[in-house]
């Protein structure tokens, strides 16, 4: 009930202003009696992924809490894990405003945020300050002004700084809003990046006597051959997981809607089928050797079950969470428990 009222107010506001208000409000109310307004108890439905045991298979996707400011509030809602970021080595403002658009009739969102964040050092402070023991993944990227050829250096810097504070690390090379970033998904650039990250992971594991899994987040706008090549690179470099998928540059199902022609990545319900298609193909190529976290267009428990059926071991929500609220978490967990 509270979420429906809050949503009605938020949806009258500019989307990015509403986002900042929501994160700020959650930050203020976390670990206080006011969590009763949005908190809920969800019976455990444990799932093992990447060598980790999560209390349930529903996580918050990266992009909602970029700087890790409201982690404890999302824990109160019942998420099995929270993925913060995308974070970059240095703070950056992101792309020009406006850069976030709702497509309400289609339950979609278009964003061209551009990795706006306060930098990895600020994120680490927030990870240290959190009071709950929720599993937190850290999604890392490169700064906009770092040449693609030197992009791996930014990922290694972020890895070094977040390693001790992350349950797992997600490598984001699939955002469409950082020029040239998606080129890291192909050929020699992909293999060089994954190899460098794996080497760094093993060095940090030896140094800290702690193994932190690494997952790669991929785009939905890939051919079968490109998915096969990514899968082979993941297996070759012994990555721990894959996250499929990021937002799409296609506009299937939204043509004619207000804001549909805005540039950026489309998420939400219009992404549902494309994401499932990629997960199915990726699962075939990975042959069970590497687990998949399914994300993209989950607006109901049935959408989540379709991700599991396609080959995902765990799921994440973002746009569906904005449109449906915290009840979606419980609905998915209950459906997962019964499947």
Curated annotation (Swiss-Prot):
Pfam families (alphabetical): DHO_dh
Annotated FMN binding sites: 62-66, 86, 139, 172, 217, 245, 268, 297, 318-319
Disulfide bond residue pairs: none
Active site: 175 (nucleophile)
UniProt remark on cofactor binding: Binds 1 FMN per subunit.
Subcellular location, principal: membrane
GO cellular component terms, A-Z: cytoplasm; plasma membrane
Record-listed substrate binding positions: 66, 111-115, 172, 177, 246-247
GO biological process: 'de novo' pyrimidine nucleobase biosynthetic process; 'de novo' UMP biosynthetic process
Subcellular locations according to the entry: Cell membrane
Broad class of enzyme this protein falls into: oxidoreductase
Topology term for the membrane: Peripheral membrane protein
UniProt GO MF annotations: dihydroorotate dehydrogenase (quinone) activity
SUPFAM superfamilies attached to this UniProt entry: FMN-linked oxidoreductases
Alphabetical keyword list: Cell membrane, Flavoprotein, FMN, Membrane, Oxidoreductase, Pyrimidine biosynthesis
EC number(s) from the headed UniProt entry: 1.3.5.2
Cofactor(s) needed: FMN
InterPro entries the record matches: Aldolase_TIM, DHO_dehydrogenase, Dihydroorotate_DH_1_2, Dihydroorotate_DH_2, Dihydroorotate_DH_cat, Dihydroorotate_DH_CS
Pathway: Pyrimidine metabolism; UMP biosynthesis via de novo pathway; orotate from (S)-dihydroorotate (quinone route): step 1/1
Catalytic activity as recorded in UniProt: (S)-dihydroorotate + a quinone = orotate + a quinol
Gene3D superfamilies: Aldolase class I (3.20.20.70)
Subunit structure and binding partners: Monomer.
Matching HAMAP family: DHO_dh_type2
Function: Catalyzes the conversion of dihydroorotate to orotate with quinone as electron acceptor.
Family: Belongs to the dihydroorotate dehydrogenase family. Type 2 subfamily.
Name of the protein described by the UniProt record: Dihydroorotate dehydrogenase (quinone)
């Amino acid at each position: 009930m509270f979420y429906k009222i809050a949503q009605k107010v938020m949806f009258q506001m500019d989307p990015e202003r509403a986002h900042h208000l929501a994160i700020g409000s959650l930050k203020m109310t976390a670990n206080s009696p006011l969590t009763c307004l949005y908190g809920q108890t969800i019976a455990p439905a444990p799932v093992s992924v990447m060598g980790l045991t999560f209390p349930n298979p529903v996580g918050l996707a990266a992009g909602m809490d970029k700087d890790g400011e409201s982690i404890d509030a999302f824990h109160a809602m019942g998420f099995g894990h929270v993925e913060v970021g995308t974070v970059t080595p240095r703070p950056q403002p992101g792309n020009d405003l406006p850069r976030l658009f709702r497509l309400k009739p289609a339950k979609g969102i278009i964003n061209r945020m551009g990795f706006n964040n306060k930098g990895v050092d600020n994120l680490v402070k927030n990870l240290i300050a959190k009071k709950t023991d929720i599993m937190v993944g850290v999604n890392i990227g490169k700064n906009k002004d770092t040449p693609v050829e030197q992009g791996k250096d930014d990922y290694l810097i972020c890895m070094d700084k977040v390693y001790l504070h992350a349950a797992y690390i997600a490598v984001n090379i699939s955002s469409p809003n950082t020029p040239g970033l998606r080129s890291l998904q192909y050929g020699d650039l992909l293999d060089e990046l994954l190899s460098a990250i794996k080497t760094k992971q093993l060095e940090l594991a030896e140094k800290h006597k702690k193994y932190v899994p690494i997952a790669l987040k991929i785009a939905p706008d890939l051919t079968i051959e490109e998915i096969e090549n990514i899968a082979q690179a993941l297996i070759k470099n012994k990555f721990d997981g894959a996250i499929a998928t990021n937002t799409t540059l296609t506009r299937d199902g939204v043509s004619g809607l207000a804001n549909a022609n805005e540039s950026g990545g489309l998420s939400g319900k219009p992404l549902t089928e494309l994401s499932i298609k990629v997960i199915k193909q990726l699962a075939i190529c990975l042959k069970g050797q590497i687990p998949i976290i399914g994300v993209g267009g989950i607006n109901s428990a049935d959408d989540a079950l379709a991700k599991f059926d396609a080959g995902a071991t765990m799921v994440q929500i973002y746009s569906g969470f904005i449109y449906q609220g915290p009840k979606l978490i419980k609905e998915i967990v209950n459906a997962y428990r019964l499947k």
